[in-house]
């Protein structure tokens, strides 16, 4: 009976994860056309990365990467990442995080200033170290998945400064890495 319950839970989880990939949502923002992904070849040397830059990895065919992946720059060389189920967040040098054969986009908040950047980094530290957790409530801070963490620290930083900021371009229950690409508040800088 116990094995049967485990199999059912796994089956439902797989159905949920694969079903989400084909959900059609209507973007609340204009779609960006002619997006050019930056090819990653070792050695990786990315210049001009800044705190708050969002790096989106392209989607892959495997179940872990089918939604893409995103992480955020804490400073000019260190990334904060929420990698996958069973892991907590961690920091890593961007050169070690990027992988050959998986192209990236670097997105930057258009209205970044020193005060916002300072508060954003402070919030990265405040919400760092939690377990990876998938939730349909973007405001849930018990744990995070990669793109929810990025969305939330931008959201809460803007709230602290007295304005609204929603980087999720389709406004769904989940914020996925590709949702950042069409946000009017972000620009592609690679």
What are these regions (language model features)?
Residues 5-11:
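Sec-dependent signal peptide recognition
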Residues 17-19:
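C-terminal motif of bacterial Sec signal peptides marking the signal peptidase cleavage site
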Residues 22-28, 32-34, 137-190:
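Activation targets extended, charge/polar-rich intrinsically disordered C-terminal tails
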Residues 29-47:
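Mixed-charge, Lys/Arg-rich low-complexity intrinsically disordered regions
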Residues 46-53, 68, 76, 117-121, ...:
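Extracytoplasmic/secreted envelope proteins and their assembly/folding machinery
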Residues 49-109, 132-141:
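Glycine-rich catalytic cores of cysteine/serine-nucleophile enzymes that process amide/ester linkages
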Residues 53, 59, 83, 124-132, ...:
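Sec/Tat-exported extracytoplasmic proteins
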Residues 103, 110-129:
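A structural motif
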């Amino acid at each position: 009976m116990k094995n049967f319950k485990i199999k059912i839970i796994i089956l439902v989880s797989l159905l949920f994860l694969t079903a989400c990939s084909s959900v059609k949502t209507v973007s609340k923002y204009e779609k960006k056309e002619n997006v050019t992904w930056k090819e990653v070849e070792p050695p990786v040397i990315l210049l001009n990365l800044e705190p708050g830059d969002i790096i989106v990895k392209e989607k892959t065919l495997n179940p872990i990467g089918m939604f893409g992946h995103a992480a955020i720059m804490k400073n000019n060389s260190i990334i904060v990442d929420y990698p996958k189920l069973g892991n907590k967040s961690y920091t890593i040098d961007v050169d070690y995080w990027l992988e050959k054969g998986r192209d990236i986009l670097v997105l930057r908040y258009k209205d970044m200033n020193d005060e916002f950047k300072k508060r954003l980094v402070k919030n990265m530290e405040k919400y760092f170290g939690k377990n990876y957790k998938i939730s349909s409530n973007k405001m849930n801070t018990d744990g995070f998945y990669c793109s929810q963490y990025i969305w939330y620290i931008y959201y809460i930083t803007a709230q602290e400064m007295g304005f609204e900021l929603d980087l999720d371009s389709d406004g769904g229950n989940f914020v996925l890495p590709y949702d950042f690409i069409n946000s009017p508040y972000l620009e592609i800088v690679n």
